[in-house]
UniProtKB/Swiss-Prot annotation:
Organism encoding this protein: Solidesulfovibrio magneticus (strain ATCC 700980 / DSM 13731 / RS-1)
Keyword field: NADP, Oxidoreductase, Porphyrin biosynthesis
Protein name: Glutamyl-tRNA reductase
UniProt-annotated binding residues for NADP(+): G190, A191, G192, E193, M194, A195
Site features described as Important for activity, chain residue numbers: H100
Biased composition (Basic and acidic residues): 423-436
Length: 453
């Protein structure tokens, strides 16, 4: 049965941070397993959940529309009403879904154009889908192709030439607030990948010291050691806030970790010297009410857009070149998908050819009598099957070429009728139920799943 690729998602373009918080699924979402094993019963599923997007990739038979089932399961996992999700959702299917995924993997759909973090996040989502056994033939091939396309884009264009990321944008915004960064102190709350990037950019910008707080103290020590900073016990970081000018928080906690009342006390201890807070976590780490305090500047992910726009100019030209690369690779992946439709016909054709060869061989052996040596019988069988294979070579090569065209299904249908491949198969002799050699595995000519670069 022909399969279709569907992609449903929301991102920073379609939904504000509040909506993304409500429908975030975490790093190891169970939604994929629920979609495959639950009521939806889709064939394959992969879920990508980051600060700026949640996307659900599914494979299901053509003719079935899994959208309602996906929305219901997704909203149910978050304890939300599907009606709240629908207005912010985008949906793609077929090659439009493939094109979107390739753009995401290449960083063309990111808040910061060309940022490389999303590729690592997609790889993690794929590993989770494989471990959960929700990735099948199509998602396996699609993800590996996406990884390959992202590599091509990064090496063939200059889209990733400069160090631009959410963390970089956060540091750029801090430089706008304070001007000179020399002598400023910063604290990172959370020690994940985003914090690591922030530490690198902070150090480059000239801050004098970096404090790192994390629930796992060993990880805080590790990150602090790499950037000549100091580790802080997570339970103590609030009491140390008065020491720093800049706070970048990215814990991934399900609740606020920096409260407005704590910041009021910190400001008093600092004699109301300005403080700059960047909240790059979803759900948010920092109480939005602190924005009402004097001498406090609070920005979340959505506020970074203005800074990000200034870093896009040099990448937009490269993005056009990247689109050309992606367009070609989408076309090639489409050819591979079409080859899946023709594969059963090729297998049936090879089966019929091998069956006829064996039937004629049996007639010949009966005429020759029982005295024919087994070695001769084996040689005759090899010859008969080889002739069958060679006779079918050109028809199969023709069918593979034509199947990739716009109306390729017509050639598949014509071949099935021409060779009567849909007739009821009835064994005609003792050898009729023997499995024929798998020519598709023994010859590149019959590699019906080829989708080479």
């Amino acid at each position: 049965m022909e399969q279709q690729i569907y992609l449903f998602g929301l991102n920073h373009k379609t939904a504000g941070v509040e909506v993304r918080e409500a429908f975030a699924l975490g790093e190891r979402p169970k939604l994929g397993e629920l979609l495959v094993d639950g009521e939806a019963r889709v064939r394959e599923a992969l879920v990508l959940s980051t600060c700026n997007r949640v996307e659900v990739l599914v494979v299901d038979p053509v003719g079935r529309d899994p959208k309602a089932a996906v929305l219901a399961a997704w909203a149910g996992q978050c304890g939300q009403d599907p009606a709240l999700l629908a207005p912010h959702l985008y949906a793609h299917q077929g090659m439009a879904a493939v094109d979107h995924l390739f753009c995401v993997a290449s960083g063309l759909d990111s808040l910061v154009l060309g940022e490389p973090q999303i590729l690592g996040q997609l790889k993690a989502a794929y590993r989770h889908a494989v471990a959960s056994r929700t990735a099948g033939v199509i998602i396996n091939r699609l993800c590996h192709k996406a990884f390959s396309v992202a590599k091509k884009v990064r090496t063939a264009t200059g889209i990733g030439a400069s160090a631009v990321s959410i963390s970089y944008a956060a540091v750029e915004l801090a430089k706008r607030i304070f001007g000179e960064m020399a002598g400023k102190k910063a604290m990172l709350v959370g020690a994940g990948e985003m914090a690591e990037l922030a530490a690198m950019h902070l150090l480059t910008s000239g801050v004098s010291e970096i404090l790192v707080a994390n629930r796992t103290y060993a990880r805080a020590e590790e990150l602090a050691g790499r950037f000549k900073g100091r580790a802080v016990a997570f339970e103590e970081f609030v009491s140390r806030l008065h020491e720093v000018d800049i706070v970048i928080s990215s814990t991934g906690a399900p609740h606020v970790v920096i409260r407005a009342k704590d910041v009021r006390a910190v400001l008093k201890a600092r004699r109301h010297k300005p403080m700059f807070f960047i909240d790059i976590a979803v759900p948010r780490d920092i109480d939005p009410d602190i924005n009402s305090l004097d001498n406090v500047y609070l920005y979340d992910i959505d506020d970074l857009q203005e800074v990000v726009e200034e870093n896009l100019a040099q990448r937009r030209e490269e993005a056009a070149r990247a689109r050309d690369i992606i367009g070609l690779q989408v076309e090639r992946f489409g050819e591979w998908v079409k080859s899946l439709d023709v594969k059963p016909t090729i297998v049936d054709l090879l089966d019929v050819g091998a069956s006829l060869a064996r039937q004629e061989l049996q007639k010949t052996l009966r005429r020759l009598g029982p005295e024919v040596p087994e070695e001769t019988r084996a040689a005759l069988e090899t010859m008969a099957l080889s002739i069958s294979r060679k006779m079918l070579h050109e028809p199969i090569a023709f069918l593979k070429r034509r199947a990739k065209e716009e109306h390729g299904e017509r050639f598949v249908d014509l071949t099935r009728r021409m060779y009567n491949l849909d007739r009821e198969k009835v064994p005609t002799d003792a050898h009729a139920d023997r499995k024929p050699p798998n020519f598709a595995e023994t010859s590149d000519d019959f590699d019906v799943t080829d989708a080479s670069e």
